[in-house]
UniProtKB/Swiss-Prot annotation:
Disordered: region residues: 1-56, 214-236, 373-426
This protein's record includes keyword Nucleotide-binding: no
Protein name: Mediator of RNA polymerase II transcription subunit 4
Organism of provenance: Arabidopsis thaliana
Biased composition (Low complexity): 36-56
Biased composition (Acidic residues): 406-426
GO molecular function, one term: transcription coregulator activity
Taxonomy of the source species: Eukaryota, Viridiplantae, Streptophyta, Embryophyta, Tracheophyta
Gene Ontology biological-process annotations: regulation of transcription by RNA polymerase II
Length: 426
């Protein structure tokens, strides 16, 4: 189970092994542990040789491995960095494994299997003594296995943190390589810029004799000679601007139009329209009906102000006509119902003759012969005459008096007309 969790090798994780250069063989004592002097010496040598095994970012964590020797309780073990914590956990697990042989009921079998001596774990490592266990004297294998599982879980967490640190170091190295490549590309670009600058300097030096001479300014002596001096010192290209030419061309094309067959010297155009649609034509188009359609675009105040009101006011509603005046104009078999107004549907009598087969709206209507229609009498003509209220009498046009003033001013022209005099008065 432990082999599946620990992916990296102990050397990469910073854990010292038997073949590492930092291994020191301490002087064993009667109890099998190194003395205090040898322990401090081995710790000092391990801290000095640790930078050769670990990256620069883990040197500080490796230097704190000596702090694990001062841990007096297993509760403080979680406060250590990942590397010293993993080392302390491995030492505790080694102690538990050694005690497992002592507590096992098959101790004699293990001794015979290992040829009279039980194996020792991490005995040759120059590591400080491990912190005390939660249960320093377990009495059964079950207690040892429960403590071993707890230590194994903590070891997995420490290894996970170490793996994250290694991933961050790999990412840091990758970023460093990218920065180095970018620096090399920037350096190459700077070299190209320097070469281009050198070439441009050479070109400027070569063509320094071919500079354009400055134009001499013409002083203006009098206001009368201003136009002549400006026309002699400037050209057409300096007088005209492209923006003005385009604006004038747009103005001509918008307001001037002639049919293709029009020739010079012909009569003036009548009814010709400019090529661009005018305002009234745009308002009569189908697109103008969708001007106020909400299509999801925000409506600004400027768009509301740009709305043009209708140039032609709608005609007033027609005045109510006197229906009694047209009663005598209708045939006797057609009766006008009460409340009927012009524009409402008309119900024709049933006795009207049907149109011939194949007749369509717009075809001529065959009327009955004139002999069958009785001519109305003169009294009927007078009675059928519409009332005078239906026709509006023509308005009286009043022309203002025109004063010609022929003899008052001698400087006036010899010829005058009514139109000219009326224009002057206006």
């Amino acid at each position: 189970m432990l082999q599946h969790q620990i992916v990296q090798s102990p050397a990469r994780l910073g854990l010292t092994g038997p073949g590492s250069p930092s291994v020191q063989n301490p002087t064993p004592t009667r109890h099998g542990h190194p003395t205090s002097s040898s322990s401090s010496q081995s710790q000092h040598q391990q801290i000095q040789q640790q930078p050769n095994l670990l990256p620069s970012s883990t040197v500080a964590a490796a230097s704190s491995a000596s702090a694990s020797a001062a841990v007096s309780s297993s509760a403080l073990l979680s406060l250590l960095p990942p590397l010293p914590r993993a080392q302390a956990l491995l030492q505790q697990m080694a102690v538990l494994t050694s005690k497992l042989f002592d507590v096992s009921p098959n101790r004699a079998i293990w001794l015979s299997a290992f040829r009279g001596s039980l194996p020792s774990f991490l005995s040759s490592h120059s590591l400080p003594p491990p912190p005390p266990l939660e249960n320093p004297s377990p009495s059964s294998t079950k207690e040892i296995l429960s403590q071993f599982n707890s230590l194994q879980t903590q070891l997995f967490e420490a290894v996970t943190e170490l793996q994250e640190i290694l991933d961050l170091q790999d990412a840091k190295q990758k970023v460093a390589r990218e920065i180095k490549s970018k620096d090399s590309s920037l350096l190459a670009f700077a070299n190209k810029l320097k070469d281009a600058e050198r070439v441009l300097d050479m070109l400027v030096d070569d063509y320094s004799d071919y500079r354009k001479p400055k134009r001499s300014k013409i002083e203006e002596d009098d206001e009368d000679n201003d136009n002549e001096s400006s026309s002699s010192s400037t050209t057409v290209s300096s007088q005209l601007k492209l923006k003005d030419i385009l604006a004038y061309a747009h103005k001509i094309s918008y307001t001037t139009f002639a049919p293709p067959e029009f020739g010079a010297g012909q009569a003036p155009l009548r009814g010709a329209l400019p090529p661009a649609p005018q305002d009234e034509q745009m308002r009569a188009s189908q697109l103008y009906t969708f001007a106020d359609l909400d299509i999801g675009l925000p409506k600004t105040v400027e768009n509301m102000e740009k709305k043009v009101e209708a140039l032609i006011e709608p005609p007033p509603p027609p005045e109510a006509m006197d229906i009694s005046a047209i009663h005598n104009l209708l045939p006797p078999n057609i009766a006008v119902p009460s409340g009927w107004k012009p524009g409402m549907p008309v119900e024709l009598p049933r006795d009207l003759p049907l149109p011939p087969p194949g007749w369509k709206p717009g075809d001529p209507v065959v009327l009955p012969p004139l002999e069958s229609i009785a001519a109305p009498r003169a009294e009927d003509h007078q009675h059928m005459r519409p009332s005078q209220g239906l026709h509006r009498p023509p308005d009286v046009i009043q022309v203002r008096a025109v004063q010609l003033d022929i003899l008052e001013d001698d400087d006036s022209s010899d010829y005058s007309s009514d139109d000219a005099s009326s224009d002057d008065e206006d």
